[in-house]
Amino acid sequence: MRKPSSGQPAGLDAWDETRSLATHAGPDFALYVGDSLDCLAKLPDESINTVVTSPPYWAVRDYEHDEQLGLEDEVDDYVERLVKIFREVYRVLATDGSAWLNIGDSYFNKQITVGGKPPRTGWKRNKQLSLVPFRVALALQDDGWWIRNVAVWHKPNAMPASVRDRLTVTWEPVFLLTKSERYYFNLDEIRVPHQTSDAIERRRAESGTVTGKAQGKKELRKWLNSPRHRATIEGIKEVERRPNAPAAVELASYLRTALKEKKRSIAWVAEQLDLPFERTRHYFRTDEIGSRLPPPEVWEQLKDLLELDATYDEAMTVEVGDNVFRNHPNGKNPGDLLSIPTAPSGANHFAVMPRKLAHFALKATLPMNGSCLDPFMGSGTTGRVVRELGGRFVGVDVNEHYMTDYLVESGVISPETETLW
């Protein structure tokens, strides 16, 4: 059950028009067969809330159609063609809309030609990683899109590569694109549970030994007065502060002067404190990037070792107090690493988007009764998830055969004959 959100469904007033122009249509879907650019031109302006799509990758697979994307001789032509398609996507997308774009990469090899010949010069050479996803992303950025995220789709069940001179590729980028700075994004729909308490609470709560039970107000007061026990209360942590601490650069200059007077080196200090040199030297660095304040225990050791005066005693005094940290009740931001297994190839399509990936994207960017577009719908995974979430789906594909499963499920095609009614 999805929670209501502030997002407004786009294209409701033009939904009948969108369906009437489609090759196949139902109450909650409109499917167009043909070239993406031509089909998108039929859709009304700002009639789509979100886009979830994975276009054919460049030079990876032939889907047996002359007009398909991905068969271009030059990678630059592929990028240019995809940018043109996404200009139409930009037009049909609502002002507060967004687009999730998944593209895989490919390597130049002896089978890939550039201008009809095997690549031999420049960067387009055998065994070179094409970096197609990022070339597309930069081109889209130059064309006016906001790039809000590059999510990593990690494939835990990725097939191992047979190559011996590079790593197996186990991930693909998923770009989150928007038309403007402000857009619909329902983070609460995709939050994940808080798995552990933060380090401060855990360290405080697990230290020491507790005996007996807190009974009555007097014992309860003693229990609350114990920092260790107080830290076990959700949201309350004991923290250390230096409210009057000097700038790290200022203190470093003071320490360097004392070190010079002692005629000692930073290496000597590190040895005396039994600390790594790389850590110790930061306390003596006078540049803002590398300078660090020593922690309380190290500061006390430095005072004794270098025979420091009381100049910074008050400034370096540590105060201990309670801070209240409250985790978001709905969970935490899931982050941009999505570990989702690949989906098995379907009977009618090789590269099937995992339902879990489409579900994640749509939960965040598809409002209730909103509309979603997939200009490269393939077998229709995105459309199925849109239906599950109560949305409206607009799908486009150059090959009608790939739509078979979706059309059977929608009652447009007889499962026995697989012919159009």
Curated annotation (Swiss-Prot):
Record's catalysed reaction(s): a 2'-deoxycytidine in DNA + S-adenosyl-L-methionine = an N(4)-methyl-2'-deoxycytidine in DNA + S-adenosyl-L-homocysteine + H(+)
UniProt keyword terms in alphabetical order: DNA-binding, Methyltransferase, Restriction system, S-adenosyl-L-methionine, Transferase
InterPro entries assigned: DNA_methylase_N4/N6, MeTrfase_CN4_CS, RM_Methyltransferase, SAM-dependent_MTases_sf
Methyltransferase in keyword set: yes
UniProt-listed Enzyme Commission number(s): 2.1.1.113
One MF term in the entry's GO annotations: N-methyltransferase activity
Disulfide bonds: none
BP GO terms, sorted: DNA restriction-modification system; methylation
Keyword Iron-sulfur belongs to the record: no
The protein's role, per its UniProt record: A beta subtype methylase, recognizes the double-stranded sequence 5'-GGCCNNNNNGGCC-3', methylates C-? on both strands, and protects the DNA from cleavage by the SfiI endonuclease.
Similarity comment text for this entry: Belongs to the N(4)/N(6)-methyltransferase family. N(4) subfamily.
Protein name: Type II methyltransferase M.SfiI
